[in-house]
Amino acid sequence: MPSSTSLVRELRNISEKRGLVIASTADIHSPKHLEELRKAVKKVRERPDLVLLAGDLINKGKVDWYAPTIETISKLEAERIIAIFGNEEYDETHDMLKEEFGDIVTFLDDESIKLEIKGVSLGVVGTKGSLEQPTTWQERNIPGIREVYEKRVKKVEKLLMELDSDIKILLMHYSPTFKTLFGEYRNIWPQLGHRGYEKVIEIARPDLVIHAHAHNGSKRAVLWNIEILNVSFPLWREIVVVKLSKRADLEQYF
């Protein structure tokens, strides 16, 4: 039986022998939730093949807290750690974080990667995502931010369509749908995500979509039989663990 301290969701058809174990979290805002993260890591009973981090590991660009956060996550002993940047990893910190932690963490910034794990090819597209309504600060300080967000939607679709792998995962910070925002005030939903990605998901058909940012939102939603997981740590208070099988198995299930 799965531990009650972790979510083990069997998506469609799971092969216990060949399934990939993926652990995911985000919104640690270190040091705010760092101690609680340490406790959560100790409760994960299954060694993951891959860790996916959906941004905001640190609070307000405090890069000094990235090291203890990654050190904690590394105790999961996964084969690979992939991360994206959230809005709290300020743009000016990206190069610094890549340089300092690039040997431990693979950072994806509107990029994709293809891995071979347990004989299964797994592709990940990683992006900060977009907002339908940029924040007041963004409007004032980032020239052309609305255009940046709209172009990113199209770029992510292109990256997913070009990804040739048994399993495809879309890893984002901002929400790709409003369906996982229930629990947040409705008037701020446009500043938490962008529904343009719903069409991307429908067209490109990733096997799993992971996002964060909505601390008080919903844990999951389903779009076109595709699981959308909001892995925000303040929402779960634990590491989210998912098992995925090969696409061939998924097709046989339906």
Task: Kindly label every feature range from the protein language model.
Residues 28, 171-176, 207-217:
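Histidine-centered catalytic micro-motifs
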Residues 16-19, 113-118, 147, 196-204, ...:
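Binuclear metal-dependent phosphoesterase catalytic core
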Residues 76-77, 158-167, 200-207:
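A structural motif corresponding to the C-terminal end of an alpha-helix
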Residues 21-22, 50, 122-123, 167-169, ...:
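Structural motif
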Residues 26, 54-56, 86, 172, ...:
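Active-site flanking residues adjacent to catalytic metal/cofactor-binding acidic residues
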Residues 1-32, 76, 249-254:
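Acidic, histidine-bearing metal-coordination/catalytic regions of metal-dependent phosphoesterases
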Residues 15, 95-187, 232-233, 247:
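Conserved catalytic scaffold of divalent metal-dependent phosphoesterases
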Residues 30-118, 184, 191-196, 200-203, ...:
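Core catalytic region of metal-dependent phosphoesterases/phosphodiesterases
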